[in-house]
C-alpha cells in the first residue's frame, strides 16, 4: 500500500462504523527487510490531519476484542482507528494470544519458535490430560517480551500467513 493511501484508509472510520487497524510490520522473516512506518509515526501523522483524534477509554477498547490494538477516534466519527505497534509499543506483558498453525503446531508467540506439535499428539492418541499439559506448557513458554528493537535477525521458518500473523 502506498503511504499516501493511509489517511484515506483511516478516513473510512469517519463515515462508517468500522474499526480500521494499522499493524506495524514485525521484523520476522521477510518483514525484517521491508520498509515501514512505525505506529508512533503514523499516529503523529493522523493527529496532524485530525487534531481531535483521541484514545478510546480502556473499557471501550476491551469491548472491541481485548486484543493488542489501541483505538482512537474523533468526536462525531462512526468508527475507530486501531494501532497494533508490535515493535514500538510492546504489549507482550498483556498478550493473551497463542497461535495454532495450519500444520497443527501451537506457538506461544509470533516471534518464538517454541511450542508443541498438537497434531502429532492427537494422531498418536494422546489423552486429554497429555494435551492439556502440552497446551499449558506452551502457554507458560510465552516470552516476557520481545526484543525487536535490537534488530536481531529473528528467523521465521514459515511465512507470517502460516503462523497466524
Language model: regions and residue ranges:
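Auxiliary Fe-S-binding modules of radical SAM enzymes
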Residues: 14-15, 25-165
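Structural preference for beta-strand elements that scaffold enzyme active sites
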Residues: 19-21
Amino acid at each position: 500500500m502506498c503511504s499516501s493511501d493511509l489517511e484515506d484508509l483511516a478516513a473510512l472510520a469517519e463515515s462508517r462504523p468500522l474499526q480500521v487497524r494499522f499493524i506495524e510490520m514485525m521484523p520476522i522473516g521477510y518483514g525484517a527487510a521491508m520498509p515501514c512506518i512505525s505506529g508512533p509515526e503514523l499516529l503523529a501523522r493522523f493527529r496532524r490531519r485530525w487534531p481531535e483524534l483521541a484514545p478510546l477509554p480502556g473499557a471501550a477498547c476491551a469491548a472491541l476484542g481485548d486484543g493488542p490494538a489501541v483505538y482512537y477516534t474523533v468526536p462525531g466519527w462512526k468508527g475507530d482507528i486501531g494501532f497494533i505497534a508490535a515493535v514500538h509499543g510492546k504489549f507482550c506483558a498483556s498478550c493473551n494470544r497463542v497461535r495454532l498453525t495450519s500444520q497443527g503446531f501451537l506457538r506461544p508467540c509470533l516471534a518464538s519458535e517454541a511450542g508443541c506439535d498438537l497434531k502429532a499428539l492427537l494422531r498418536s492418541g494422546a489423552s486429554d490430560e497429555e494435551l492439556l499439559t502440552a497446551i499449558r506448557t506452551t502457554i507458560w513458554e510465552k516470552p516476557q517480551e520481545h526484543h525487536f528493537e535490537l534488530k536481531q535477525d529473528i528467523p521465521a521458518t514459515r511465512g507470517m500467513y502460516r503462523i497466524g500473523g
